């Protein structure tokens, strides 16, 4: 009977992890804009839903490079001044807290690589409509802008 060495176990772990990353990237590239938005918003359903963190891995996966840079710049400026960032809430639900039971998500294709998603929901009695401009790149769909009743995400991030 052959013993599995630690090295073989580690190599097998890396192979599985690499395969998972590759299959996730392939799945993301195959997603429809509606699938992309459904995958985001399912994280916000229910009173104790955690939402999505806006950490580096999430921003890399979800946003276009220019919008990602604006989010990072806002966080850096705030940290430098020891202040709260201009983005002081969750841009996906336009709130700091939420209790959402369901979402009505519709998508309108603008071009083969551009779509606009409209998300309607009730956040504990506050009716909201969020519009997301989506752009497809080689690794899947990304958000290029989010618009709420308060304006665009880029405008909020700039502090204007």
Residue positions per predicted region:
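Surface-exposed, charged secondary-structure patches
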Residues: 63-126
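N-terminal export leaders
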Residues: 6-10
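Short, low-complexity N-terminal intrinsically disordered segments enriched in polar/charged residues
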Residues: 3-4, 18, 22-54
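Structured segments of extracytoplasmic/periplasmic soluble domains
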Residues: 39, 43-47, 51, 62-66, ...
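Low-complexity, intrinsically disordered terminal/linker segments enriched in charged
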Residues: 110-114, 118, 123-131, 137-138, ...
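Sec-dependent signal peptide hydrophobic core
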Residues: 13-17
């Amino acid at each position: 009977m052959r013993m599995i060495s630690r090295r073989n176990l580690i190599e097998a772990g890396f192979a599985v992890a690499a395969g998972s990353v590759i299959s996730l990237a392939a799945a993301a590239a195959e997603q429809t804009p509606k699938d992309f938005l459904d995958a985001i918003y399912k994280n916000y359903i229910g009173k104790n839903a955690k939402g999505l963190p806006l950490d580096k891995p999430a921003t890399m996966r979800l946003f276009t490079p220019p919008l990602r840079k604006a989010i990072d710049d806002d966080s850096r400026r705030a940290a430098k001044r020891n202040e709260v960032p201009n983005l002081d809430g969750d841009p996906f639900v336009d709130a700091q807290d939420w209790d959402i039971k369901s979402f009505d998500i519709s998508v309108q294709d603008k071009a083969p690589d551009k779509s606009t998603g409209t998300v309607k929901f009730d956040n504990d009695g506050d009716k909201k409509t969020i519009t997301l401009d989506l752009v497809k790149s080689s690794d899947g769909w990304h958000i290029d802008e989010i618009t709420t009743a308060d304006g665009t995400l880029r405008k909020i991030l700039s502090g204007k």
